[in-house]
Amino acid sequence: MRFLLTYCLLLFSLPIAAATEDVFSRFQDRLVQIRILEASTGAQAGVGSGFFASSRGLIVTNYHVISDLILHPQHYRAEVVTTDGQRAPLQLIDFDAVHDLAVVQTQLPPRRAFEMHTTNPPIGMRLFSIGTPLDLGFTIVEGTYNGLLEASLYEKIHFTGSLNPGMSGGPAVLRNGQVVGVNVATAGNQVSFLVPARFVRALLLRAQNLHGLTPKAALAQLRDQLNANQNAYMQRLIDTPVTSTSLGHYRVPNKLAPFIKCWGDSKAEPTQRYQQVVQECSSEDNLYVSRTHTTGVIQFQHQWLSTRALNRFQFYSVYQEQFNANYPGIPASADDVSQYACHTDFVQSHNVRFKVALCLRANKRLPGLYDAVLKAATLNENHGGVLTTLVLAGVSANNALRFSQHYLESFRWNP
């Protein structure tokens, strides 16, 4: 019986293996590896995947694969390597940083191109993801289409398959070779994500009459794309009524939008003479700018502190120390952002009195965009209060101010 079961499983796996091999053999000439090279030495600094997507020879990949060409054009160059070993320098034609896509071109003769699938496949449809994982050569991974992610700010396809570093920018195709999405990220354990093909079609349509971007034009385009994107989602947040939840003696902002997730915890050390309840919320749709810089972050944290063991002066000392504590930062280097500049004030919103500090730092390469940190402490009680911290990355100063006000106006004191 055991032998029969093993034999049946082997027979079942043969058609799957044959299908995978068939897909790769039919479409491998349309694939490329993209190598990012240090300009002065030619040493490899990064690797990704791509594929021919037009009769003109346009190649699609991820924005994050080629971002060094935009942010550090004097330090990096790039080349493509085809499956038959041909190499050629590439030129950046266009990109969509919000959806992590880019179009490049080489001087190689145009090859057969992949076609884009025009509808969403049924849930459970088999997909074949192709790329160059860990610089180990071209590899095909079979997986399953599981539809679009729910509660996500940006459309992504949930792909059940194992994507690895180096596969970014490669296609995920149906058995007929039509592209359903572009490999973009993984959460491990066969949970991976694809950029839907409709965004590829839109970018290719825009790129078909373009002939390349200078570094200056590319950087300006990056700034414009991120600025337009933050205006759109910040307006959406400001226009959405804030839901609230109880924390201590207050009503505090809870889930600001479907794409924001929240969780809570309580902390009470045996030697600690005050109680602490923490609620944290964040989006999971951060945007990649460069290997040192992340933007699009939306995070906030509430802490309810209360005590029966401390007098008002002792509690205020603890409260002030917590208010001054640093909140985990937004990933960025000193080359990416300036130092924070802060303004502190006392304000009242409805029946809540606050001490408020609003800090901004400028994005050096993306003028007009800032990272903002709002810290506020309620001042209505002598032995309890809420400390709240709001973090926004890559927003305009005006949107930081508008949303900070919108956020604070949602607090209520319920003594």
Report the location of each language-model feature.
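A conserved glycine-rich beta-strand in the N-terminal activation segment of trypsin-fold
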Residues: 19-20, 37-56, 88
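C-terminal cap/linker of serine protease catalytic domains
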Residues: 20-24, 90, 179-251, 413
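Active-site substrate-binding loop(s) of clan PA
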Residues: 23, 69-70, 91-93, 106-136
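Active-site region of chymotrypsin-like
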Residues: 27-43, 107-113, 136-212
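Catalytic-histidine neighborhood of serine endopeptidases
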Residues: 47, 54-97, 302-308
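Surface-exposed amphipathic alpha-helical segments
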Residues: 211, 259-260, 382-415
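Non-catalytic interaction/regulatory modules that flank or connect domains
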Residues: 229-340
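Signature of long, low-cysteine stretches enriched in small and polar/charged residues
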Residues: 317-378
